[in-house]
Each structure stands twice: as C-alpha cells, then as structure tokens.
C-alpha cells in the first residue's frame, strides 16, 4: 500500500501574548522584549525557512499578536499561509468564565477575518487546555478542527465531549473514587492531535517562572527525537499525520533553524510525504472518515 504521510508545521505566535497569559512575564520588560523578538524578528525568519523549502504552514495567532505585529501578520497572509485562532492574550480557557472564553474567541475570529478576508477554520487552545465548553463554542462559531487534545498522536479523530472521571479525595472512603473513566459523546469537531514531544517550546525556551523550564536542551537532541518519531511513523503506518508545533520565540533562533533544515531535508527523502496546512489535514480526514450520525 502506498504511503500517505501528511506533514505540517503549526506555528503558535505566542510572542508578547505568551508572557501576558501563560509564562509569568507580564511585569517584566525583559520578557516582553523577548516577545517582541518573536514577532518582529522571528516571524520573518520562519517565513524565509518555509519559502526556502516551498512549505505551507498554519500560523495559530493570539489576537494580541495580530494587532501588535500587523506588518508581520500581513507577510504571513501574503505568503499564502493559513491563519488559525489561539486566544487573545494566551489566556487559559480553564481559568475563564464561559462568557470570557466566548468573548475572546469572537474577538479572535473578528481579527482573523479582518486580516485574511475569511473566518478561521482551526483553533489551538493556549497551553493546550480545553475547558468543558471549548468544543461547544468552536462548533457554535463555525470551526472545523482543533489542535489541542491528545487521545491519539498521529491519527486525527472526532472530538468527544462529556468524559467524566473521579478525582481522589482522601477524606472519603476509597470506594468513592475507585471508578473508571466514563466516555462522553462524539461531536463533529475534528481533532488533529497535539503532541508535547513534537513541540519546540518546553525543552528549548527558558522561562524564569516555570519550574520545569529548560531552555538549553541541544537542538541536535531534539531534532533527532523528532526524526526518530517520523521514522517510526513512516515504518509502521501507511496513513498518518505528522504535525510539529513550533514558536517564533524558539524556532527562529539560529541553532533551531538549522535543526528544522535537517528535519525537513530528512522528511523530504521519503516517498508518499505531502506537506500541507492543518485545514487540508482536516478536509482529508473528513473525506476518509465521514461521521455516522
């Protein structure tokens, strides 16, 4: 059977928004300056990388980045890339009220429409955190796919909502928490799985307020880890989606750009590989797996 391996870069433009909403840098001029680097220097460097190898990409942008880096965002659109939603200030959906989460989503949609001329079809939850209404809001506002959950790794699926589980409460009897997870119901939202082991940020970006922040892991090690994952997928699967999550904050650094060149050139040696946008992945999945209602 011929191989069909869909490969994609998802670029999260966290920039200043990441420091405001997730990384604890909202009071640090130095950390904010790192966010400015991501938008003003990092975006053009990644665009140059994608142009060199003729690759499409999907850029998931906080609304804050769209408004703060309007010139660079226009460059992304002019290059023909897809733009998806990623919060406004990289807010944690779990921490927001239902109204706050919807207001942020609506603002994101509005900004992307103004930028690209069309509504976004895809969403990435900041910090990959899904609230108990995120799925409902995405479907309500016309989204086709999400890229935040991890029920699988290299195969898309339909998002399920309503899973429930019992947390341990040592003030109760053990029988009160010894219960299995109960699965909810499938929805129309396509999930393109997220994967912490194909994300550049945790190992290669130093965050002062994060206890598990590294920032100085060698790109040679990370690059080999990503190549090893691709090699296993190519050997074991005839159809698969291999999506990598990167950030201009991290992947626009020289040592990481060189890592990506090696990964791209390695992947391109294989037959049956196609570089695509995330929207193309979702459309391909829907054709292969029409949902039975």
UniProtKB/Swiss-Prot annotation:
Q: Which InterPro entries does UniProt cross-reference here?
A: Glyco_hydro/deAcase_b/a-brl, NODB_dom, PgdA-like
Which residues take part in binding Zn(2+)? 14, 86, 90
Q: What GO molecular-function term can you cite, just one?
A: hydrolase activity, acting on carbon-nitrogen (but not peptide) bonds
Q: Mind telling me which CDD domains this protein's record contains?
A: CE4_HpPgdA_like
Q: What induces it?
A: Its expression is markedly up-regulated upon cell exposure to oxidative stress. Is also significantly induced (3.5-fold) when H.pylori cells are in contact with macrophages.
Task: Outline the temperature dependence of activity.
Answer: Optimum temperature is 50 degrees Celsius with acetylated xylan as substrate. Retains about 80% of the activity at 30-55 degrees Celsius.
List UniProt keywords, sorted A-Z.
Answer: Carbohydrate metabolism, Cell wall biogenesis/degradation, Hydrolase, Metal-binding, Polysaccharide degradation, Stress response, Xylan degradation, Zinc
Catalysed reactions listed for this entry: Deacetylation of xylans and xylo-oligosaccharides
State the EC number(s).
Answer: 3.5.1.-, 3.1.1.72
Instruction: Kindly list the biological process annotations in GO that this record carries.
Output: cell wall organization; xylan catabolic process
What pH-dependence text does the entry carry?
Optimum pH is 6.0 with acetylated xylan as substrate. Is active at acidic pH ranging from 5.0 to 6.0.
Spell out the SUPFAM superfamilies in the cross-references.
Answer: Glycoside hydrolase/deacetylase (SSF88713)
List, for all copies, the residue spans of the domain called NodB homology: 29-276
How is the subunit organization of this protein annotated in UniProt?
Homotetramer.
What's its job?
Catalyzes the N-deacetylation of peptidoglycan (PG), an important mechanism that appears to confer lysozyme resistance and to mitigate host immune detection; this likely contributes to pathogen persistence in the host. The exact nature of the residue in PG that is deacetylated has not been determined. Is also able to catalyze the deacetylation of acetylated xylan, and, to a lesser extent, that of chitin and chitosan. Therefore, this enzyme might play a role during infection, considering that xylan-containing carbohydrate structures are among those commonly consumed by humans.
Q: Which family does it belong to?
A: Belongs to the polysaccharide deacetylase family.
Protein name (Swiss-Prot/TrEMBL): Peptidoglycan deacetylase
Q: What is the lineage of its organism?
A: Bacteria, Pseudomonadati, Campylobacterota, Epsilonproteobacteria, Campylobacterales
């Amino acid at each position: 059977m011929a191989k069909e391996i869909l490969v994609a870069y998802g670029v999260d433009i966290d920039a200043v928004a990441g420091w405001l909403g997730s990384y604890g840098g909202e009071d640090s001029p130095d950390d904010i300056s790192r966010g400015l680097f991501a938008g003003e220097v990092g975006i053009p460097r990644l665009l140059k990388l994608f142009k060199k190898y003729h690759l499409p990409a999907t850029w998931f942008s906080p609304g804050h980045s769209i408004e703060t880096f309007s010139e660079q965002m226009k460059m992304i659109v002019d290059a023909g890339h897809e733009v998806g939603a990623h919060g406004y200030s990289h807010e944690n959906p779990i921490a927001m009220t239902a109204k706050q989460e919807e207001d942020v989503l609506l603002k994101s949609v509005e900004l992307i429409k103004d930028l690209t001329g069309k509504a976004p079809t895809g969403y990435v939850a900041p910090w990959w955190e899904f609230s108990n209404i995120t799925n409902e809001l995405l479907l309500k506002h016309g989204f086709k796919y999400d890229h935040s959950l991890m029920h699988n790794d290299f195969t898309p699926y339909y998002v399920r909502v309503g899973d429930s589980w019992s947390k341990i409460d040592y003030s109760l009897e053990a029988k009160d928490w010894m219960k299995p997870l109960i699965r909810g119901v499938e929805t129309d939202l396509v999930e393109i799985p997220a994967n912490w082991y194909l994300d550049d940020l945790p190992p290669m970006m130093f965050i002062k307020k994060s206890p598990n922040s590294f920032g100085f892991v060698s790109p040679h090690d990370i690059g080999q880890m990503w190549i090893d994952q691709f090699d296993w997928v190519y050997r074991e699967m005839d159809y698969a989606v291999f999506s990598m999550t990167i950030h201009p904050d991290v992947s626009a650094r020289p040592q990481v750009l060189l890592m990506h060149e090696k990964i791209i050139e390695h992947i391109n040696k294989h037959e049956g590989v196609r570089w695509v946008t995330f929207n193309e992945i979702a459309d391909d999945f829907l054709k292969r797996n029409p949902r039975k209602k």
